[in-house]
A protein has these predicted regions:
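Soluble extramembrane regions of membrane proteins in the secretory/endomembrane system
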Residues: 23-238
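Hydrophobic cores of alpha-helical transmembrane segments in multi-pass integral membrane proteins
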Residues: 35, 39-42, 47-53, 57-59, ...
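Extramembranous, membrane-proximal N-terminal regions and early juxtamembrane loops
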Residues: 218-237, 259, 263-271, 275, ...
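Individual transmembrane alpha-helix segments
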Residues: 233-249
Length: 508
Protein backbone atom coordinates (compact mmCIF):
# COMPACT_ATOMS: atom_id res chain seq x y z
CA UNK A 1 0.00 0.00 0.00
CA UNK A 2 2.99 2.28 0.43
CA UNK A 3 3.48 4.79 -2.46
CA UNK A 4 7.16 3.93 -2.47
CA UNK A 5 6.37 0.23 -2.89
CA UNK A 6 3.93 0.97 -5.71
CA UNK A 7 6.58 3.03 -7.52
CA UNK A 8 9.16 0.30 -7.00
CA UNK A 9 6.74 -2.33 -8.32
CA UNK A 10 5.97 -0.19 -11.37
CA UNK A 11 9.69 0.30 -12.06
CA UNK A 12 10.22 -3.46 -11.74
CA UNK A 13 7.45 -4.18 -14.25
CA UNK A 14 8.82 -1.61 -16.70
CA UNK A 15 12.37 -2.93 -16.34
CA UNK A 16 11.16 -6.51 -16.88
CA UNK A 17 9.28 -5.44 -20.01
CA UNK A 18 12.36 -3.60 -21.29
CA UNK A 19 14.59 -6.63 -20.68
CA UNK A 20 12.12 -8.92 -22.43
CA UNK A 21 11.93 -6.49 -25.34
CA UNK A 22 15.72 -6.38 -25.58
CA UNK A 23 15.86 -10.16 -25.49
CA UNK A 24 13.27 -10.35 -28.25
CA UNK A 25 15.30 -7.90 -30.31
CA UNK A 26 18.42 -9.99 -29.74
CA UNK A 27 16.73 -13.30 -30.56
CA UNK A 28 18.36 -14.97 -33.51
CA UNK A 29 16.16 -15.83 -36.48
CA UNK A 30 15.37 -19.51 -36.83
CA UNK A 31 17.81 -21.72 -38.68
CA UNK A 32 19.14 -25.26 -38.72
CA UNK A 33 21.35 -26.52 -35.87
CA UNK A 34 25.02 -26.09 -36.70
CA UNK A 35 25.67 -29.83 -37.20
CA UNK A 36 22.68 -30.22 -39.55
CA UNK A 37 23.61 -27.07 -41.48
CA UNK A 38 27.12 -28.53 -41.88
CA UNK A 39 25.52 -31.54 -43.60
CA UNK A 40 23.91 -29.11 -46.05
CA UNK A 41 27.32 -27.50 -46.63
CA UNK A 42 28.77 -30.93 -47.45
CA UNK A 43 26.60 -31.21 -50.57
CA UNK A 44 28.10 -30.55 -53.99
CA UNK A 45 26.72 -27.64 -56.00
CA UNK A 46 27.32 -26.39 -59.53
CA UNK A 47 28.32 -22.78 -58.92
CA UNK A 48 30.43 -20.30 -60.88
CA UNK A 49 30.87 -22.83 -63.69
CA UNK A 50 32.45 -25.44 -61.46
CA UNK A 51 31.52 -28.12 -58.91
CA UNK A 52 32.29 -27.10 -55.34
CA UNK A 53 31.03 -27.56 -51.76
CA UNK A 54 27.73 -25.86 -51.05
CA UNK A 55 29.62 -24.31 -48.13
CA UNK A 56 31.41 -22.10 -50.68
CA UNK A 57 28.13 -20.80 -52.09
CA UNK A 58 26.85 -20.22 -48.54
CA UNK A 59 29.95 -18.23 -47.63
CA UNK A 60 29.76 -16.09 -50.77
CA UNK A 61 26.03 -15.53 -50.18
CA UNK A 62 26.63 -14.40 -46.58
CA UNK A 63 29.52 -12.10 -47.52
CA UNK A 64 27.44 -10.67 -50.35
CA UNK A 65 24.57 -9.77 -48.03
CA UNK A 66 26.25 -8.51 -44.86
CA UNK A 67 29.92 -8.06 -45.77
CA UNK A 68 31.13 -10.78 -43.37
CA UNK A 69 31.43 -14.55 -43.61
CA UNK A 70 29.46 -14.99 -40.37
CA UNK A 71 26.33 -13.30 -39.09
CA UNK A 72 25.68 -12.93 -35.36
CA UNK A 73 27.69 -16.05 -34.62
CA UNK A 74 25.90 -18.16 -37.25
CA UNK A 75 27.91 -20.09 -39.83
CA UNK A 76 27.40 -19.36 -43.54
CA UNK A 77 25.53 -22.67 -43.89
CA UNK A 78 23.14 -21.62 -41.11
CA UNK A 79 22.53 -18.26 -42.80
CA UNK A 80 21.79 -19.91 -46.15
CA UNK A 81 19.55 -22.57 -44.61
CA UNK A 82 17.75 -19.88 -42.60
CA UNK A 83 16.76 -18.05 -45.77
CA UNK A 84 15.90 -21.33 -47.46
CA UNK A 85 13.67 -22.82 -44.74
CA UNK A 86 12.66 -19.87 -42.51
CA UNK A 87 12.01 -17.10 -45.00
CA UNK A 88 9.37 -15.31 -42.88
CA UNK A 89 11.84 -14.95 -40.00
CA UNK A 90 14.77 -13.80 -42.09
CA UNK A 91 12.93 -11.26 -44.24
CA UNK A 92 12.57 -9.11 -41.09
CA UNK A 93 16.26 -9.45 -40.17
CA UNK A 94 18.31 -6.24 -40.76
CA UNK A 95 21.32 -7.94 -42.34
CA UNK A 96 21.45 -6.64 -45.92
CA UNK A 97 24.32 -4.17 -46.09
CA UNK A 98 23.46 -1.07 -48.14
CA UNK A 99 26.59 0.98 -48.80
CA UNK A 100 25.04 3.82 -50.77
CA UNK A 101 23.25 6.65 -48.99
CA UNK A 102 21.10 7.09 -52.10
CA UNK A 103 19.95 3.47 -52.00
CA UNK A 104 19.23 3.82 -48.27
CA UNK A 105 17.01 6.82 -49.00
CA UNK A 106 15.10 4.87 -51.62
CA UNK A 107 14.59 2.02 -49.15
CA UNK A 108 13.78 4.48 -46.33
CA UNK A 109 16.23 2.89 -43.88
CA UNK A 110 18.20 4.88 -41.34
CA UNK A 111 21.22 2.64 -40.79
CA UNK A 112 23.62 0.76 -43.02
CA UNK A 113 21.60 -2.45 -42.94
CA UNK A 114 18.17 -3.14 -44.39
CA UNK A 115 15.58 -5.88 -44.08
CA UNK A 116 14.27 -7.69 -47.11
CA UNK A 117 10.84 -6.33 -46.22
CA UNK A 118 12.26 -2.80 -46.64
CA UNK A 119 12.55 -3.37 -50.38
CA UNK A 120 8.75 -3.12 -50.75
CA UNK A 121 6.44 -0.37 -49.56
CA UNK A 122 3.10 -0.76 -47.80
CA UNK A 123 1.25 -1.52 -51.03
CA UNK A 124 3.88 -4.14 -51.98
CA UNK A 125 5.55 -2.01 -54.66
CA UNK A 126 9.26 -2.61 -55.25
CA UNK A 127 11.08 0.51 -54.04
CA UNK A 128 14.03 0.20 -56.45
CA UNK A 129 11.86 -0.16 -59.55
CA UNK A 130 13.35 2.04 -62.26
CA UNK A 131 16.23 3.24 -60.06
CA UNK A 132 19.42 3.72 -62.07
CA UNK A 133 23.08 3.73 -61.13
CA UNK A 134 25.53 1.32 -59.56
CA UNK A 135 24.45 1.83 -55.89
CA UNK A 136 20.84 0.93 -56.63
CA UNK A 137 22.08 -1.89 -58.85
CA UNK A 138 24.09 -3.43 -55.98
CA UNK A 139 21.06 -3.37 -53.66
CA UNK A 140 18.84 -4.79 -56.41
CA UNK A 141 21.37 -7.58 -57.01
CA UNK A 142 21.22 -8.59 -53.34
CA UNK A 143 17.42 -8.64 -53.47
CA UNK A 144 17.48 -10.90 -56.53
CA UNK A 145 20.11 -13.24 -55.06
CA UNK A 146 17.95 -13.75 -51.97
CA UNK A 147 15.05 -14.59 -54.26
CA UNK A 148 17.15 -17.15 -56.13
CA UNK A 149 18.19 -18.81 -52.86
CA UNK A 150 14.70 -18.82 -51.34
CA UNK A 151 13.12 -20.35 -54.45
CA UNK A 152 15.95 -22.88 -54.69
CA UNK A 153 16.93 -21.89 -58.24
CA UNK A 154 20.51 -21.07 -57.17
CA UNK A 155 21.01 -24.51 -55.58
CA UNK A 156 21.91 -26.58 -58.61
CA UNK A 157 22.68 -29.68 -56.56
CA UNK A 158 21.17 -32.45 -58.71
CA UNK A 159 23.41 -33.87 -61.47
CA UNK A 160 21.86 -35.91 -64.25
CA UNK A 161 22.94 -37.27 -67.61
CA UNK A 162 20.95 -35.65 -70.40
CA UNK A 163 19.54 -38.47 -72.57
CA UNK A 164 19.70 -36.28 -75.69
CA UNK A 165 23.48 -35.79 -75.73
CA UNK A 166 24.80 -37.92 -72.81
CA UNK A 167 26.34 -34.84 -71.16
CA UNK A 168 26.29 -34.29 -67.40
CA UNK A 169 24.12 -31.36 -66.37
CA UNK A 170 23.13 -29.87 -63.03
CA UNK A 171 19.62 -28.83 -62.04
CA UNK A 172 17.88 -27.19 -59.12
CA UNK A 173 14.56 -28.46 -57.82
CA UNK A 174 12.69 -25.82 -59.87
CA UNK A 175 14.49 -26.35 -63.20
CA UNK A 176 12.84 -28.07 -66.11
CA UNK A 177 14.04 -31.61 -66.80
CA UNK A 178 14.17 -33.63 -70.03
CA UNK A 179 11.08 -35.76 -70.61
CA UNK A 180 13.30 -38.76 -71.36
CA UNK A 181 14.73 -38.71 -67.82
CA UNK A 182 13.65 -41.76 -65.77
CA UNK A 183 10.52 -40.99 -63.75
CA UNK A 184 12.06 -41.99 -60.42
CA UNK A 185 15.09 -39.77 -60.94
CA UNK A 186 12.96 -36.80 -61.99
CA UNK A 187 10.74 -37.33 -58.95
CA UNK A 188 13.76 -37.39 -56.64
CA UNK A 189 15.16 -34.17 -58.13
CA UNK A 190 11.83 -32.38 -57.85
CA UNK A 191 10.79 -33.60 -54.39
CA UNK A 192 13.94 -34.21 -52.31
CA UNK A 193 14.33 -30.66 -50.99
CA UNK A 194 10.58 -30.38 -50.41
CA UNK A 195 10.83 -33.45 -48.19
CA UNK A 196 13.74 -31.83 -46.35
CA UNK A 197 11.53 -28.77 -45.76
CA UNK A 198 8.80 -30.98 -44.28
CA UNK A 199 11.29 -32.56 -41.89
CA UNK A 200 12.59 -29.10 -40.92
CA UNK A 201 9.04 -28.06 -39.99
CA UNK A 202 8.77 -31.18 -37.79
CA UNK A 203 12.24 -30.40 -36.33
CA UNK A 204 13.31 -33.94 -37.20
CA UNK A 205 16.99 -33.10 -37.40
CA UNK A 206 18.13 -36.71 -37.70
CA UNK A 207 15.76 -37.15 -40.63
CA UNK A 208 17.02 -33.94 -42.28
CA UNK A 209 20.64 -35.06 -41.97
CA UNK A 210 19.73 -38.49 -43.35
CA UNK A 211 18.02 -37.07 -46.45
CA UNK A 212 20.92 -34.68 -47.08
CA UNK A 213 23.33 -37.60 -46.93
CA UNK A 214 21.15 -39.47 -49.45
CA UNK A 215 21.29 -36.46 -51.78
CA UNK A 216 25.08 -36.47 -51.47
CA UNK A 217 25.20 -40.19 -52.28
CA UNK A 218 23.04 -39.51 -55.34
CA UNK A 219 25.42 -36.72 -56.39
CA UNK A 220 28.48 -38.95 -56.14
CA UNK A 221 26.78 -41.80 -58.01
CA UNK A 222 25.38 -39.65 -60.81
CA UNK A 223 28.39 -37.31 -61.10
CA UNK A 224 30.94 -40.10 -61.24
CA UNK A 225 34.32 -39.06 -62.62
CA UNK A 226 33.18 -35.45 -63.09
CA UNK A 227 33.14 -34.83 -59.34
CA UNK A 228 36.14 -33.22 -57.61
CA UNK A 229 38.30 -35.59 -55.61
CA UNK A 230 37.66 -35.98 -51.91
CA UNK A 231 40.98 -34.30 -51.15
CA UNK A 232 40.16 -31.26 -53.28
CA UNK A 233 36.69 -31.05 -51.72
CA UNK A 234 38.14 -31.07 -48.20
CA UNK A 235 40.85 -28.59 -49.22
CA UNK A 236 38.21 -26.09 -50.34
CA UNK A 237 36.28 -26.48 -47.10
CA UNK A 238 39.49 -25.91 -45.15
CA UNK A 239 40.21 -22.82 -47.25
CA UNK A 240 36.75 -21.45 -46.47
CA UNK A 241 37.24 -21.96 -42.74
CA UNK A 242 40.74 -20.46 -42.54
CA UNK A 243 39.98 -17.04 -44.02
CA UNK A 244 41.38 -14.79 -41.27
CA UNK A 245 42.55 -12.02 -43.61
CA UNK A 246 40.92 -9.12 -41.76
CA UNK A 247 42.35 -9.76 -38.27
CA UNK A 248 45.74 -10.59 -39.82
CA UNK A 249 45.74 -7.38 -41.86
CA UNK A 250 44.73 -5.29 -38.84
CA UNK A 251 47.46 -6.88 -36.70
CA UNK A 252 50.07 -6.30 -39.41
CA UNK A 253 49.13 -2.64 -39.90
CA UNK A 254 49.07 -1.85 -36.18
CA UNK A 255 52.39 -3.65 -35.67
CA UNK A 256 53.86 -1.86 -38.67
CA UNK A 257 52.80 1.59 -37.44
CA UNK A 258 54.10 0.92 -33.94
CA UNK A 259 57.32 -0.56 -35.30
CA UNK A 260 57.82 2.35 -37.70
CA UNK A 261 57.49 4.95 -34.91
CA UNK A 262 59.79 2.93 -32.67
CA UNK A 263 62.34 2.49 -35.49
CA UNK A 264 62.39 6.25 -36.16
CA UNK A 265 62.92 6.93 -32.46
CA UNK A 266 65.74 4.39 -32.29
CA UNK A 267 67.45 5.70 -35.45
CA UNK A 268 67.42 9.25 -34.06
CA UNK A 269 69.08 7.96 -30.90
CA UNK A 270 71.42 5.65 -32.78
CA UNK A 271 70.04 2.47 -31.25
CA UNK A 272 68.96 -0.81 -32.84
CA UNK A 273 66.05 -3.11 -32.03
CA UNK A 274 66.62 -5.29 -28.98
CA UNK A 275 67.12 -9.01 -29.53
CA UNK A 276 63.75 -9.84 -27.95
CA UNK A 277 61.84 -7.29 -30.03
CA UNK A 278 63.62 -8.42 -33.19
CA UNK A 279 62.78 -12.05 -32.41
CA UNK A 280 59.08 -11.34 -31.89
CA UNK A 281 58.84 -9.26 -35.09
CA UNK A 282 60.58 -11.94 -37.16
CA UNK A 283 58.35 -14.62 -35.63
CA UNK A 284 55.27 -12.61 -36.63
CA UNK A 285 56.54 -12.27 -40.20
CA UNK A 286 57.27 -16.01 -40.37
CA UNK A 287 53.84 -16.93 -38.96
CA UNK A 288 52.07 -14.62 -41.40
CA UNK A 289 54.14 -16.00 -44.27
CA UNK A 290 53.25 -19.59 -43.36
CA UNK A 291 49.56 -18.71 -43.19
CA UNK A 292 49.61 -17.00 -46.60
CA UNK A 293 51.63 -19.88 -48.06
CA UNK A 294 48.95 -22.31 -46.89
CA UNK A 295 46.10 -20.15 -48.21
CA UNK A 296 47.74 -19.61 -51.60
CA UNK A 297 48.54 -23.32 -51.89
CA UNK A 298 44.95 -24.29 -51.01
CA UNK A 299 43.47 -21.76 -53.44
CA UNK A 300 45.81 -22.88 -56.21
CA UNK A 301 45.02 -26.56 -55.59
CA UNK A 302 41.26 -25.94 -55.50
CA UNK A 303 41.17 -23.74 -58.60
CA UNK A 304 43.65 -25.84 -60.57
CA UNK A 305 45.92 -22.91 -61.51
CA UNK A 306 48.47 -20.59 -59.93
CA UNK A 307 46.58 -18.10 -57.74
CA UNK A 308 47.71 -14.96 -59.57
CA UNK A 309 44.88 -14.52 -62.07
CA UNK A 310 42.94 -11.55 -60.62
CA UNK A 311 43.23 -8.58 -58.28
CA UNK A 312 42.32 -10.51 -55.14
CA UNK A 313 44.93 -13.19 -55.77
CA UNK A 314 47.72 -10.87 -56.93
CA UNK A 315 47.40 -8.65 -53.85
CA UNK A 316 47.62 -11.68 -51.56
CA UNK A 317 50.63 -12.87 -53.55
CA UNK A 318 52.19 -9.43 -53.12
CA UNK A 319 51.66 -9.71 -49.35
CA UNK A 320 53.38 -13.11 -49.44
CA UNK A 321 56.30 -11.71 -51.50
CA UNK A 322 56.61 -8.83 -49.04
CA UNK A 323 56.89 -11.15 -46.05
CA UNK A 324 59.44 -13.31 -47.87
CA UNK A 325 61.56 -10.28 -48.78
CA UNK A 326 61.27 -9.03 -45.20
CA UNK A 327 62.68 -12.29 -43.88
CA UNK A 328 65.51 -12.18 -46.43
CA UNK A 329 66.55 -8.55 -45.80
CA UNK A 330 65.59 -7.98 -42.16
CA UNK A 331 68.68 -9.63 -40.68
CA UNK A 332 70.86 -7.14 -42.54
CA UNK A 333 68.50 -4.12 -42.39
CA UNK A 334 66.39 -4.39 -39.24
CA UNK A 335 64.41 -1.21 -39.87
CA UNK A 336 62.76 -2.94 -42.87
CA UNK A 337 60.69 -5.06 -40.47
CA UNK A 338 57.99 -2.40 -39.86
CA UNK A 339 57.82 -1.68 -43.60
CA UNK A 340 57.19 -5.37 -44.28
CA UNK A 341 54.33 -5.43 -41.80
CA UNK A 342 52.76 -2.29 -43.28
CA UNK A 343 53.03 -3.38 -46.91
CA UNK A 344 51.69 -6.88 -46.20
CA UNK A 345 48.81 -5.51 -44.11
CA UNK A 346 47.82 -2.92 -46.71
CA UNK A 347 48.02 -5.53 -49.48
CA UNK A 348 45.65 -7.79 -47.55
CA UNK A 349 43.24 -4.91 -46.93
CA UNK A 350 43.22 -4.05 -50.64
CA UNK A 351 42.63 -7.70 -51.55
CA UNK A 352 39.45 -7.66 -49.46
CA UNK A 353 37.92 -4.64 -51.19
CA UNK A 354 34.70 -5.30 -53.02
CA UNK A 355 36.23 -4.93 -56.48
CA UNK A 356 39.14 -7.20 -55.57
CA UNK A 357 37.15 -10.14 -54.22
CA UNK A 358 36.01 -12.33 -57.11
CA UNK A 359 35.07 -15.91 -56.36
CA UNK A 360 37.24 -18.91 -57.19
CA UNK A 361 36.56 -19.58 -60.87
CA UNK A 362 37.95 -21.58 -63.75
CA UNK A 363 40.36 -19.58 -65.88
CA UNK A 364 39.51 -18.45 -69.37
CA UNK A 365 41.96 -20.17 -71.79
CA UNK A 366 44.03 -17.05 -72.51
CA UNK A 367 44.87 -16.76 -68.80
CA UNK A 368 45.77 -20.41 -68.33
CA UNK A 369 49.43 -19.99 -69.29
CA UNK A 370 52.68 -20.47 -67.34
CA UNK A 371 53.99 -17.31 -69.01
CA UNK A 372 51.24 -15.32 -67.29
CA UNK A 373 52.22 -16.78 -63.92
CA UNK A 374 55.88 -15.82 -64.43
CA UNK A 375 54.84 -12.37 -65.67
CA UNK A 376 52.62 -11.65 -62.65
CA UNK A 377 55.11 -13.04 -60.12
CA UNK A 378 57.97 -10.92 -61.45
CA UNK A 379 55.83 -7.78 -61.46
CA UNK A 380 54.48 -8.42 -57.94
CA UNK A 381 58.02 -8.92 -56.59
CA UNK A 382 58.99 -5.62 -58.25
CA UNK A 383 55.99 -3.83 -56.73
CA UNK A 384 56.81 -5.22 -53.27
CA UNK A 385 60.40 -3.96 -53.56
CA UNK A 386 59.19 -0.56 -54.80
CA UNK A 387 56.81 -0.36 -51.85
CA UNK A 388 59.80 -0.93 -49.54
CA UNK A 389 61.61 1.89 -51.34
CA UNK A 390 58.57 4.17 -50.92
CA UNK A 391 58.34 3.53 -47.17
CA UNK A 392 62.10 4.02 -46.97
CA UNK A 393 61.52 7.41 -48.58
CA UNK A 394 58.90 8.28 -45.96
CA UNK A 395 61.31 7.33 -43.17
CA UNK A 396 64.12 9.27 -44.86
CA UNK A 397 62.02 12.44 -45.07
CA UNK A 398 60.96 12.08 -41.43
CA UNK A 399 64.54 11.54 -40.23
CA UNK A 400 66.29 14.01 -42.55
CA UNK A 401 66.58 16.90 -40.09
CA UNK A 402 67.25 14.99 -36.89
CA UNK A 403 69.37 12.12 -38.21
CA UNK A 404 71.04 12.95 -41.51
CA UNK A 405 73.24 9.88 -41.27
CA UNK A 406 70.19 7.63 -41.00
CA UNK A 407 68.59 9.35 -44.01
CA UNK A 408 71.75 8.75 -46.05
CA UNK A 409 71.81 5.12 -44.94
CA UNK A 410 68.18 4.71 -46.02
CA UNK A 411 69.08 6.21 -49.40
CA UNK A 412 71.82 3.62 -49.89
CA UNK A 413 69.49 0.76 -48.95
CA UNK A 414 66.71 2.06 -51.21
CA UNK A 415 69.10 2.40 -54.14
CA UNK A 416 70.28 -1.16 -53.49
CA UNK A 417 66.66 -2.39 -53.66
CA UNK A 418 65.96 -0.45 -56.83
CA UNK A 419 68.29 -2.65 -58.88
CA UNK A 420 66.39 -5.94 -58.38
CA UNK A 421 63.07 -4.04 -58.49
CA UNK A 422 63.77 -2.49 -61.89
CA UNK A 423 65.21 -5.77 -63.17
CA UNK A 424 62.11 -7.73 -62.09
CA UNK A 425 59.80 -5.09 -63.58
CA UNK A 426 61.68 -5.09 -66.90
CA UNK A 427 61.75 -8.90 -66.99
CA UNK A 428 58.04 -9.00 -66.14
CA UNK A 429 57.21 -6.62 -68.98
CA UNK A 430 59.34 -8.69 -71.37
CA UNK A 431 57.67 -11.98 -70.37
CA UNK A 432 54.28 -10.26 -70.60
CA UNK A 433 55.06 -9.21 -74.16
CA UNK A 434 55.98 -12.78 -75.09
CA UNK A 435 52.71 -14.00 -73.49
CA UNK A 436 50.77 -11.36 -75.45
CA UNK A 437 52.33 -12.58 -78.70
CA UNK A 438 51.42 -16.19 -77.90
CA UNK A 439 47.86 -15.23 -76.93
CA UNK A 440 46.96 -12.46 -79.38
CA UNK A 441 49.69 -12.51 -82.02
CA UNK A 442 51.39 -9.23 -81.10
CA UNK A 443 54.06 -8.24 -78.60
CA UNK A 444 52.95 -4.68 -77.86
CA UNK A 445 49.67 -2.89 -78.46
CA UNK A 446 49.92 0.32 -76.42
CA UNK A 447 47.20 -0.91 -74.12
CA UNK A 448 46.79 1.38 -71.02
CA UNK A 449 48.41 -1.26 -68.82
CA UNK A 450 51.37 -1.61 -71.17
CA UNK A 451 51.81 2.16 -71.40
CA UNK A 452 51.75 2.69 -67.65
CA UNK A 453 54.04 -0.27 -66.99
CA UNK A 454 56.56 1.32 -69.37
CA UNK A 455 56.11 4.70 -67.66
CA UNK A 456 56.77 3.08 -64.26
CA UNK A 457 59.90 1.38 -65.58
CA UNK A 458 61.27 4.65 -66.99
CA UNK A 459 60.44 6.60 -63.83
CA UNK A 460 62.27 4.15 -61.58
CA UNK A 461 65.21 3.90 -63.96
CA UNK A 462 66.03 7.57 -63.32
CA UNK A 463 67.40 7.19 -59.73
CA UNK A 464 69.76 4.48 -60.96
CA UNK A 465 71.59 7.09 -63.07
CA UNK A 466 72.83 9.27 -60.23
CA UNK A 467 76.15 9.64 -62.07
CA UNK A 468 74.41 11.54 -64.87
CA UNK A 469 71.64 13.08 -62.76
CA UNK A 470 73.29 14.73 -59.73
CA UNK A 471 69.95 15.54 -58.00
CA UNK A 472 69.61 11.89 -57.03
CA UNK A 473 72.79 12.09 -54.96
CA UNK A 474 70.95 14.29 -52.47
CA UNK A 475 69.16 12.10 -49.87
CA UNK A 476 66.16 14.40 -49.39
CA UNK A 477 65.47 14.76 -53.13
CA UNK A 478 65.94 11.01 -53.61
CA UNK A 479 63.46 10.15 -50.85
CA UNK A 480 60.83 12.61 -52.07
CA UNK A 481 61.21 11.26 -55.60
CA UNK A 482 60.72 7.66 -54.41
CA UNK A 483 57.54 8.66 -52.58
CA UNK A 484 56.13 10.46 -55.63
CA UNK A 485 57.26 7.74 -58.05
CA UNK A 486 55.11 5.17 -56.25
CA UNK A 487 52.07 6.96 -57.69
CA UNK A 488 52.99 5.44 -61.06
CA UNK A 489 52.75 1.97 -59.48
CA UNK A 490 49.33 2.80 -58.04
CA UNK A 491 48.08 4.07 -61.40
CA UNK A 492 49.50 1.02 -63.21
CA UNK A 493 47.81 -1.45 -60.87
CA UNK A 494 44.63 0.18 -59.57
CA UNK A 495 43.99 2.88 -62.15
CA UNK A 496 44.18 0.52 -65.10
CA UNK A 497 42.50 -2.49 -63.47
CA UNK A 498 39.52 -0.62 -62.04
CA UNK A 499 39.21 2.71 -63.88
CA UNK A 500 40.67 2.56 -67.38
CA UNK A 501 39.66 0.21 -70.15
CA UNK A 502 41.82 -2.17 -72.12
CA UNK A 503 42.53 -5.85 -72.38
CA UNK A 504 44.05 -6.01 -68.89
CA UNK A 505 41.07 -4.57 -67.02
CA UNK A 506 39.13 -7.88 -66.81
CA UNK A 507 41.99 -9.42 -64.82
CA UNK A 508 41.43 -7.04 -61.91
Amino acid sequence: RSPALRKAALCLVLCTAAVQGARAADTLPQTLPREVAAELGDLYVYYNDRICPLQTLAKDFTVKLCGKSRYRGLTPEQVLSGWLFYYDDWKREPMIRIRSAGARRLLEVGGRYARLSDFRNRVNEYRLEGAAGRPAGEADEKFNIIGMVCTGSMLRIFPYTDPSDSLLRWASQVDGLPRELPHGQALFIGRAMNYVSELVVKRDWAGVAGVLRKIRSYQQKEGGAHMPSGLRFRAEKLYNRLDWSLPLAAAFILTGIGGFLDACRRMVRGRAFGAKTRGWLLAGVAAGGLYLTLMLALRGYVSGHWPVSNGYETMRFMAWCTLLLTLLFARRFLFLLPFGYLIAGLSLIVSMMGESNPQITQLMPVLDSPLLCIHVMLVMVAYALLAFVMFGGVAGVVLHRRARGAAAQLQAVSRLMLYPAVFCLAAGIFVGAVWANVSWGRYWGWDPKEVWALVTLLVYALPLHAGSLPWFRRPLFFHWFCIAAFLSVLVTYFGVNFLLGGMHSYAG
